[in-house]
Amino acid sequence: MCLDGDRPVGYARVVRFGNIEELTELMVDPEHQGRGVGRALLGRVWPGDPSPDLGRVVVATGAPADLSLYTNFGVMPAAGHWHLRQRTDDYLERRSKEIDAAEPAVHVLEADRAVAEWQRLEPEALGHERPAVHEFFGRERTCLACMDESTGRAAGLCWVSTDGEIGPAVGQEPKDVVPVVLAALDRVAMTQEPPQLGVFASTIAWWLLRRLRGLGFRVHWPGWVMSSEPIPGLDRYLPTRPPNLL
């Protein structure tokens, strides 16, 4: 935290998951921006350079100057990170007209099974494990899953909360994330009835983006996933909402 006298004017927070440190928050008071506060905070939470034993990742949604600042701390763009929105009534109307879309059945998983399936699928997509995150979601959110009939295991998973927060989601393959995300959107649209639906998606998740674009979703705010090393499976992954974590 950075203080001006007794007044907080900025703070940063890093969370470690195995061999990755994720910057989850970097905030500077508008009156103190442009004075090097952000750089100083980053220097405290991310000292030195990343290494093969301890990498770095951040979901960056700031201005161009902010993105340039992150590159000085060893992270580079891995993929775009789009906040997508659509009016709920328009979404439901478009979904009702989808007569060709034959989709796999989606089921609700019990919390213990959901956490186990997440611990199997997510590390292959992100390149690191986050068991504590999914143990928390197992208590706070519902896990939707489509199953691979040949193995009896989950092919796609998506967490959704009772207040309409969708994500993260992951699939064995890029196409497998689509049915669970749509099922989560359907669930929120019909039970919560918010004025708008929102999700985050990486710009290389083409299977998902194609379906969302066909349902009228538009880019509300662009950002970047920035990392010190390649992330192997962002094409089959839907980031967390709210976007403090990847």
What are these regions, as identified by a protein language model?
Residues M1, D6-V15, E22-M27, G152-G167:
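Conserved beta-strand in the GNAT
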Residues L23-T24, G48-P64, T191-T203, W221-G223:
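Conserved GNAT acetyl-CoA-binding A-motif
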Residues E25-V28, G34-G48, L67, N72, ...:
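Conserved acetyl-CoA-binding loop-helix of GNAT-fold acetyltransferases
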Residues D112-E149, L182, D186-M190, T203-L246:
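N-terminal charged segments
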Residues D53, N72-E165:
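Amide-forming acyltransferase catalytic core, primarily the GNAT-like/NAT-type
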Residues E140-C146, G152-A201:
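Flexible loop/N-cap segments at domain edges
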Residues D66-T71, V75, R210-L212:
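Conserved active-site tyrosine of GNAT-family acetyltransferases
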